[in-house]
Structure formats: C-alpha cells, structure tokens
C-alpha cells in the first residue's frame, strides 16, 4: 500500500523557511516552479489563513504566492466544525498572548476536511513538562498524516537541476 497522499496541505513555515534559507529562488527556482505546477493540478493547497499570514509581509515570497497557482482553501462550515473540536481538545495549539501559531488549527482543520497530508517544518514536542503543542502532536492524536518538506520532496520524487553559471 502506498503512503503517497492525494493532496497535501502546506503550513506557512514550509514556504517561509524554504524561501529564506535553503530553496531561495536565486539558486533553486525549480522548487517554486514545481510548487506552482503542483498547485495547478490540485496536488497541494494552502488554507486561507496561511495565505494571509504570508502576504501580510510585502516581500518577494508574498509576491510569488499571489501570482502562483496554488489553491487557497477558504473557510467553510465543515472546516469550522473541525476547528471547534481542535480548539476544544488542544487549546495550547495557539499562543494567543503572543499571537503565534494562529493558522495552525486551520491547517489541521483544512487537512481533515480534504483528507490531506500536512506538510510542516514543525516537530513533535515530546517534553512532558512542555506547555506547548505543535501540529504533529495534534495530527498524531487525531490520526492525521503529517510529513516535513524533505519527506514531501522525496515522496513526490521531486528532482532539482544544478549548474554552474
């Protein structure tokens, strides 16, 4: 049985960190072209709140995202039903005092609604005394598949071309 997903829901950190660090379009334009193609065929999507989080900053990533073909999933009634359950059971997922992780429950809710695999840079919190909870913790508890961006690249057999200029 294949573990390959039909759809992938991207967390904001997958795009932000890739743009700022290891897949900067100056030296890895292929990554962004592939994401655009995956968006066109409906293989990937981002929740509306992830989109808003990224375009809030007027930078090159936000400009790219606005012009990309990655579908932006809007908030719907079924998604809000999932949100209520997530926030009831995992109130520490969102840090309201610092306005952090505000899109995280929406990433999970949209993935649930679409039966999609979440792609995130977050890692499980395993410390027993931690007052934080991350997307992978909630996913594991709710039976939602999640992977990091390197697993995503491997799973879709994405290849990059390199050359000297």
Residue map of PLM features:
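PIN-domain endoribonuclease scaffold, especially VapC-family toxins
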Residues: 48-101
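Short histidine/acidic/glycine/proline-rich micro-motifs that form metal-
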Residues: 22, 51-52, 122-127
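Acidic, PIN/NYN-like endoribonuclease modules and their adjacent C-terminal/linker elements
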Residues: 2-4, 28, 124-165
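Short, well-structured N-terminal submotif of metal-dependent ribonuclease cores
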Residues: 1-46, 53-66
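Noncatalytic, typically N-terminal accessory segments of nucleic acid-processing enzymes
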Residues: 1-7, 16-18, 77, 81, ...
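Acidic, metal-associated active-site segment
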Residues: 99-119, 131-134, 138
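Short internal beta-strands
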Residues: 45-48, 139
């Amino acid at each position: 049985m294949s573990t390959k997903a039909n759809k992938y829901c991207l967390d904001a950190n997958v795009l932000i960190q890739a743009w700022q660090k290891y897949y900067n379009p100056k030296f890895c334009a292929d990554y962004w072209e592939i994401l655009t193609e995956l968006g066109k065929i409906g293989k990937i999507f981002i929740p509306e709140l992830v989109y808003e989080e990224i375009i809030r900053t007027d930078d090159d990533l936000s400009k790219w995202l606005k012009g990309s073909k990655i579908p932006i999933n809007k908030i719907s009634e079924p998604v809000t039903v999932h949100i209520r359950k997530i926030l009831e059971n995992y109130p520490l997922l969102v840090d309201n005092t610092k306005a952090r992780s505000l899109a995280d429950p929406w990433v999970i809710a949209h993935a649930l609604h679409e039966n999609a695999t979440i792609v995130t840079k977050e890692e499980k919190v395993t410390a027993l005394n931690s007052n934080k909870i991350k997307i992978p913790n909630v996913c594991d508890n709710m039976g939602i598949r999640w992977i990091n961006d390197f697993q995503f690249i491997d799973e879709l057999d994405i290849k990059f071309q390199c050359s000297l200029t």
